[in-house]
């Protein structure tokens, strides 16, 4: 072997060694089985590697940036190894969020020589989206227009975490096949039908309103996301009266300064809580609402001049129909909150006010206040005592009343009762004059007028004695009566 051949052999060996070293450091996936899981396609899903079992790679590995599209250039070789097209996105996507055993890798991109196990929940899984391979079909007789690969999944919508953490509110993202992004918002065109279709597809009820740019920018991040940002604008609405998602949106180029479509649906959660305070029952009082963990008075609003808001509030308190409502005078020391929607169920945000006109609500109480248990017990005890007294004292009182009535009935007046007649006396109808004389004690019991007073010498019947005295001088009329009726008649 001459010197020229030796030099060529040495150069070949050095080149092979250099290529091997560069390959091991720059493309560590060589020799490691990399696959994408979590979808029906081999070209999109969570990045997993075979290392004593399948491991899911964290999105913070190899110090990747948060820009999904910038990271895509680092995955060209991986997509080719998987038999897919060019890479589209590399980073954390919420499409697939069921990682297995997670590992965090350091060093050059796609190097698995310096990886450590990470506990579940400490890092977000890494996702990769590659272009689907084109299907090889026989050439048709006519030239077909160039089209994108057929989508592997039906088109769908997704909401970026909503306003103040509310469910069913936020920026709308549309995914159709391998293309995903937000929708261009045009303030001049606000089709309600499109909003209803979006909320219905998301199972969030009906469309309420659009979120402004300030409200969208102020959307807080969930705890599990470090830098949440919606995808770039890649779609725009093309038909406001569409019936399917594919008919509603068309592709568009990214425009700087454009606003993404953000909606609020009727089924947002949590809802505003309400109550009535300061009244005689839970169905009467001043309307208050709960914002976060504090209660505040609900101020009167021009958006709710009718009874609709207050009827809904009565229903929330499980009361009857609305009876009345009136606005109270504003007080400097009475702050509150304002709802700009017509009904409380539509209020996704509340505005603070320093001078609040409170509203006093009166609803029909389905359970009116009855007698207190103590009052009922007192009434029952009183009735029991009354019955006992009637049983014990009733017969005795009855006997006394009957006796008194009979004694009064036994007394009668005998004699003239004319104006010019002066003779009158009282006697018992059961006793005669003779019996009175013969048995004075018994007569005194029946008639207290039958005996003269013990301490007096006067007669008990002066008129009768006078008549008898005068009749003694007259001829005897052979009358069997105790006294002369003719003389008594003259008197």
Swiss-Prot record:
- Gene3D superfamilies to which the protein is assigned, alphabetical: SRCR-like domain
In this entry, the parts of the chain located on the Cytoplasmic side of the membrane are: 399-491
Q: Which residues carry this modification: Phosphotyrosine?
A: 449
Domain of life (superkingdom): Eukaryota
Q: Which UniProt keywords apply?
A: Cell membrane, Disulfide bond, Glycoprotein, Membrane, Phosphoprotein, Receptor, Repeat, Signal, Transmembrane, Transmembrane helix
Instruction: Give the InterPro entries listed for this entry.
Output: SRCR, SRCR-like_dom_sf, Tcell_CD5
Q: Which residues form the SRCR domain?
A: 34-131, 157-266, 274-364
How does the protein's chain sit in the membrane according to the entry?
Answer: Single-pass type I membrane protein
Q: How does it associate, per the subunit comment?
A: Interacts with CD72/LYB-2. Interacts with PTPN6/SHP-1. Interacts with CBL. Interacts with CD5L.
This one is known as T-cell surface glycoprotein CD5
Organism annotation: Rattus norvegicus
Supply the gene name: Cd5
């Amino acid at each position: 072997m001459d010197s020229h051949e030796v030099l060529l052999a040495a150069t070949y060996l050095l080149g092979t060694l250099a290529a091997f070293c560069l390959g091991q450091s720059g493309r560590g996936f060589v020799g490691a089985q990399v696959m994408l899981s979590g979808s029906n396609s081999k070209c999109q899903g969570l990045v997993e590697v075979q290392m004593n079992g399948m491991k899911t790679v964290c999105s913070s590995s190899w110090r990747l940036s948060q820009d999904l599209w910038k990271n895509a250039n680092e995955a060209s070789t991986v997509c080719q190894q998987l038999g897919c097209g060019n890479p589209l996105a590399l980073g954390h996507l919420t499409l697939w969020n069921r990682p297995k055993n997670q590992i965090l890798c350091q060093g050059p991109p796609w190097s698995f020589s310096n990886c450590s196990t990470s506990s579940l929940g400490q890092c977000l899984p890494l996702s990769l989206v590659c272009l689907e391979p084109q299907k090889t079909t026989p050439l048709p007789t006519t030239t077909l227009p160039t089209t994108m690969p057929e989508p592997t999944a039906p088109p769908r919508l997704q909401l970026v975490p909503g306003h103040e953490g509310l469910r069913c509110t936020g920026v709308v993202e549309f995914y159709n096949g391998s293309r995903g992004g937000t929708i261009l918002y045009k303030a001049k065109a606000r089709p309600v039908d499109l909003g209803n279709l979006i909320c219905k597809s998301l199972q969030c009820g009906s469309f309420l309103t659009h979120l402004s740019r300030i409200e969208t920018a102020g959307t807080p991040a969930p705890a599990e996301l470090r830098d949440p940002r919606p995808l770039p604008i890649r779609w725009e609405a093309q038909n406001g009266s569409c019936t399917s998602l594919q008919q509603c949106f068309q592709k568009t180029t990214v425009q700087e300064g454009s606003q993404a479509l953000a909606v609020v649906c009727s089924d947002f959660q949590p809802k505003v809580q309400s109550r009535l305070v300061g009244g005689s029952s839970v169905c009467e009082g001043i309307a208050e609402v709960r914002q976060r963990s504090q209660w505040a008075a609900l101020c009167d609003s021009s958006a709710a001049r009718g009874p609709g808001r207050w009827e809904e509030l009565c229903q929330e308190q499980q009361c009857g129909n609305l009876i009345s409502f009136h606005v109270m005078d504003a007080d400097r020391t009475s702050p509150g909150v304002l709802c700009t929607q017509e009904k409380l169920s539509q209020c996704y945000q509340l505005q603070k006010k320093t001078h609040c006109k409170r509203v006093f609500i009166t609803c029909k109480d389905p359970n009116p206040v009855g007698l207190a248990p103590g009052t009922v017990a007192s009434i029952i005890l009183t009735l029991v005592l009354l019955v006992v007294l009637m049983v014990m004292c009733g017969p005795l009182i009855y006997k006394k009343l009957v006796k008194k009535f009979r004694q009064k009935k036994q007394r009668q007046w005998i004699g003239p009762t004319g104006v010019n007649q002066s003779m009158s006396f009282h006697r018992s109808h059961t006793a005669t004059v003779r019996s009175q004389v013969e048995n004075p004690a018994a007569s005194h019991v029946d008639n207290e007028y039958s005996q003269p007073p013990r301490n007096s010498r006067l007669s008990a019947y002066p008129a009768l004695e006078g008549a008898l005295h005068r009749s003694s001088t007259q001829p005897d009329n052979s009358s069997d009566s105790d006294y002369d009726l003719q003389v008594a008649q003259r008197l």
